[in-house]
Regions:
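Short, flexible segments with low predicted structural confidence
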Residues: 19, 23-25, 50, 54, ...
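Canonical Radical SAM [4Fe-4S] cluster-binding loop centered on the CxxxCxxC motif
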Residues: 33-73, 84-85
């Protein structure tokens, strides 16, 4: 910019690399700053049963062909390979991962691999039916999106969600034994910034 001081920073190659080291045959996976990579996020689908205003349009979405979506066998093999170079934590995401058919089967497959942490990010709409089976399958933790505790606002931001269903799902998750559930909230000025105290109180209870 004209008149502004110029700040020159070195260009860092952010490509992952494998360095030789103890612990595995190939050594741990590291990033361009030599930090070990131990955490993997896997998007199971780009499909979702919500249309949150900050995430996607209400209609006209270009979805990936189903043939391009990784099979459970491919996901399992990828996780096994990455565990050999240091990955110990996996989070299943989407889209909305609970709309993926036979999700419980995938969780069972991955839980048998001996990961330190296996978690799932979800909008919570299907937790009433899935919380207990997910826990039994070996899932360790849940991340659940709750942007508001007001039904009118919830419907406004999700365009089709059911707040009562999500809150009931959180109750089911706690009853199933999920004791370290994380609640995610997108802070939006002028929309839900008057609810942060109430959201914290809800999570505390």
């Amino acid at each position: 910019r004209s008149g502004s001081s110029s700040l020159h920073l070195p260009i860092v190659d952010g490509k992952p690399a494998v360095r030789t080291g103890p612990g595995t045959a190939a050594g741990p996976l590291v990033d361009g700053l030599s930090r070990s990579i131990s955490y993997l996020r896997i998007s199971l689908t780009d499909r979702c049963n919500y249309r949150c205003t900050y995430c996607m349009p209400d209609e006209g979405i270009d979805l990936a062909p189903r043939a391009d979506v990784l099979s459970f066998e491919e996901i399992e093999h990828a996780v096994e390979a990455l565990m050999r170079v240091g990955v110990r934590k996996v989070r299943l995401t989407g889209g909305e991962p609970t709309v993926r058919k036979d999700l419980i089967d995938l969780v069972q497959r991955l839980s048998r691999l001996g990961l330190d942490d296996l978690s799932l990010s979800t909008n919570g709409e299907r937790l009433v039916e899935l919380a207990a089976p997910l826990k039994d399958a070996g899932l360790h933790r849940l991340n659940v999106s709750v942007d508001t505790l007001r039904e009118d606002r919830f419907l406004q931001v999700t365009r089709r969600g059911n707040l009562a269903q999500v809150l009931a799902g959180l109750d089911k998750a706690r009853a199933a034994g999920f004791v370290h559930t994380k609640v995610n909230c997108v802070a939006m000025r002028g929309f839900n910034d008057d609810e942060f105290a109430a959201l914290c109180a809800y999570c505390w209870d």
